[in-house]
Each structure stands twice: as structure tokens, then as C-alpha cells.
């Protein structure tokens, strides 16, 4: 907006350049041009981000920069009807985990994507410290018991990629789940990357 890239048209009137980032418009009859291309107006924001390592999915990080600092200020400060302003992370990734992170200010969307009852698959590419073998793959598929829950947790999919790599699909989102599941089968996660949530994958332009 401040660069003069945005033009606004209301109720069929000619487009007029907007340079005020705090300007408010009635969405009824609103049309937008950004650098000459028409953009649809969206009431809610949906962001697909490639989270780098060394960032926290928190508005108040404890030891590493917040992933929210990667976003433009208008998205961080986007007004909402809730007490919290701006978009929120749809689930979280550990600070050392990279990959697909969704952010939105649509509460219903966040609930649909994170509710355990919805069984939204999440795909992780795992690099391990020790070689991956068929026994470990089988155990992950059959289920392993984590230290805080007597109920076995199963991987929805476990695919061997290389001697120290596998692709793991989970339907839950427990705390440090991938790392704890690999530890339960006698291995250790060295690198962790989330490549997919449901049908959404990281596009090549963000890899």
C-alpha cells in the first residue's frame, strides 16, 4: 500500500490509488488492483509459510525469534473480533523443525485443521541418528506407547526413504510426537521437516 501498488474501486467507480494502509472500506462492491492485477477481497487471512529452523511458533518466544516476525505487520496486527489480534499458527512446530506451517485468523478453519476428531493427516520427513530398519517401521505402524499415555499411538503411514530417512504420516498432534515415537523404537530424530497438512503441500517456490 505504502509503495503505491494498490488501487481501489467502489461500486463500479474508477480505480483510485490507495496509499493509506489504515484505510477501511465497505467490502460490498469493493475491487482491488495490486500492481495492475485484480485481487479478490478476502474477509479472512490464510497463510502458507515455510517455517525455518531456529524460530518459535509463539507470540511471546522464550529463546528464539518468533515465526510471526517473518510476517508483514498488517498480518501480525490484522484486527479480529477476538481478543488476540492478527493471524495465529494452526498448530505448532518445534523451534528446530522446518516446513509447512499454516496461519489464519479464521477460528473455524483453525479448529477443523487441529481438532483430533478431524483426523487431518500431517506428513513429516524424518532424518534419524541411527539406521532405519523394517522392525522400526513395523512398530511405528503397529503403535508405540509414549510416557504420558498408556494408549498406543500409531503412525497412519511410515515409508522408508533411505538408510537414515523415513516419511511419517500422523493423524494426531501430541507434544514432540515424532521425536518421542522414534525414541520409543530405539532411534533418534536428527532433522524434522513437515511437508504436508491434509491436501496442502509446500509449493516449489517456498522450498
Labelled PLM ranges:
Residues 2-207:
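Basic, flexible Lys/Arg- and Gly-enriched helix-loop patches that mediate nucleic-acid binding at interfaces
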Amino acid at each position: 500500500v505504502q509503495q503505491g501498488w494498490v488501487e481501489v474501486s467502489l461500486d463500479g467507480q474508477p480505480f483510485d490509488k490507495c496509499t493509506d494502509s489504515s484505510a477501511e472500506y465497505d467490502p460490498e462492491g469493493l475491487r482491488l488492483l495490486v500492481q495492475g492485477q485484480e485481487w479478490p477481497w478476502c474477509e479472512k487471512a490464510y497463510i502458507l509459510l515455510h517455517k525455518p529452523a531456529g524460530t518459535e511458533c509463539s507470540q511471546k518466544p522464550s529463546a528464539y525469534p518468533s515465526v510471526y516476525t517473518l510476517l508483514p505487520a498488517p498480518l501480525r496486527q490484522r484486527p479480529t473480533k477476538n481478543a488476540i489480534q492478527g493471524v495465529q499458527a494452526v498448530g505448532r512446530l518445534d523451534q528446530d523443525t522446518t516446513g509447512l506451517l499454516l496461519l489464519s485468523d479464521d477460528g473455524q478453519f483453525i479448529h477443523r485443521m487441529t481438532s483430533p476428531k478431524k483426523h487431518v493427516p500431517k506428513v513429516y520427513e524424518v532424518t534419524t541418528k541411527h539406521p532405519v530398519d523394517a522392525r522400526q517401521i513395523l512398530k511405528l505402524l503397529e503403535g508405540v506407547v509414549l510416557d504420558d499415555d498408556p494408549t498406543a499411538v500409531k503412525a497412519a503411514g511410515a515409508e522408508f526413504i533411505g538408510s537414515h530417512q523415513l516419511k511419517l504420516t500422523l493423524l494426531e498432534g501430541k507434544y514432540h510426537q515424532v521425536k518421542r515415537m522414534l525414541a520409543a523404537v530405539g532411534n533418534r530424530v536428527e532433522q524434522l521437516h513437515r511437508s504436508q497438512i491434509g491436501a496442502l503441500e509446500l509449493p516449489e517456490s517456498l522450498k
